[in-house]
From Swiss-Prot:
This is UPF0758 protein Bcep1808_2579. The keyword Lipid metabolism does not apply. A motif (JAMM motif) lies at residues 207-220. One of its GO terms (biological process) is proteolysis. Belongs to the UPF0758 family. Keywords: Hydrolase, Metal-binding, Metalloprotease, Protease, Zinc. The keyword Metal-binding applies. Residues 136-258 form the MPN domain.
């Protein structure tokens, strides 16, 4: 600990029999204190975020923090603004973009693209988790919103099954297959077997169309009919089949097809 020692004033002459007291020392103690970094710049986004919170930053400044540095002859703020402009200045559209889109943007290499893709996926998973916790199964709109978050932006087809108890409480959500409905292995007997294992009273099935169109195909309708009949044999019910696009959904139940 740093200290400074100061000599006491000279003492008067004393008799040898009367020894002089030991000289006193005054110690100045400097307590440690927080100091700003020498190069702290409160006007920069990172410093303002730490001092005032993320709400103090613009969308472009938040994106700039993710990019870290500029590229393609631009500084980082110009790069962030250009990236947002590509998506109509919409953070949501940027987060909904397919992963490969980022690597085609000037100045964004694999490292920066990986950061953006990771943030996109973290955001998506957090929203899916939040939606699942709050999802009332007896609300078709809430179920469709959850499914759109979970599989709406996948670049390939995914088949999802929601297993429900007798009170329409959610038991489990499982992704049964990937690919396309004409090629992926969706076996009604396996879904029925899983329903029996989970003691499920009813099910909701869903799959996405990466093209964005939600009109069911003939194969979609055939699979729905076969599964509906197979579940009826074990006293379980197919409540709905939801086709999920990027921005819309189609409900077999709402259309009167179940």
């Amino acid at each position: 600990m740093p200290s400074s020692c100061v000599a006491a004033p000279a003492t008067e002459c004393r008799d040898l029999a009367d020894p002089a007291p030991a000289p006193a020392h005054r110690v100045a103690i400097e307590w440690p204190r927080k100091r700003r970094a020498r190069n702290w710049k409160p006007h920069l986004p990172r410093e303002r975020l730490l001092e005032r919170g993320p709400a103090a930053l613009t969308d472009a400044e938040l994106v700039a923090l993710l990019l870290g540095t500029g590229g393609g002859g631009r500084d980082v703020f110009d790069s962030a603004r250009a990236l947002l402009a590509r998506f109509g200045d919409s953070l949501r559209d940027m987060l909904d973009a397919q992963p490969g889109v980022f690597t085609t943007h000037p100045g964004i290499g694999d490292a920066r693209a990986a950061v953006l893709i990771a943030v996109t996926e973290i955001t998506r998973r957090a929203l899916v988790e939040k939606a699942r916790r709050r999802m009332p199964i007896d609300s078709p709109g809430a179920v469709e919103d959850y499914l759109r978050l979970r599989i709406g932006m996948r670049p390939y087809e995914v088949f999802v099954t929601l297993y429900l108890d007798a009170r329409h409480g959610l038991i489990e959500v499982e992704e049964s297959a990937r690919g396309s409905l004409t090629r992926m292995a969706v076996y009604p007997r396996e879904i029925v077997r899983r329903a029996l294992m989970l003691n499920a009273a009813s099910l909701i099935i869903a799959h996405n169309h990466p093209s964005g169109a939600v009109q069911p195909s003939a194969e979609d309708r055939r699979l729905t009919r076969v599964l509906h009949e197979a579940l009826a044999l074990v006293d379980a019910k197919l409540l709905d089949h939801v086709v999920v696009g990027t921005a819309d959904t189609f409900s077999f139940a709402r259309a009167g097809w179940l």
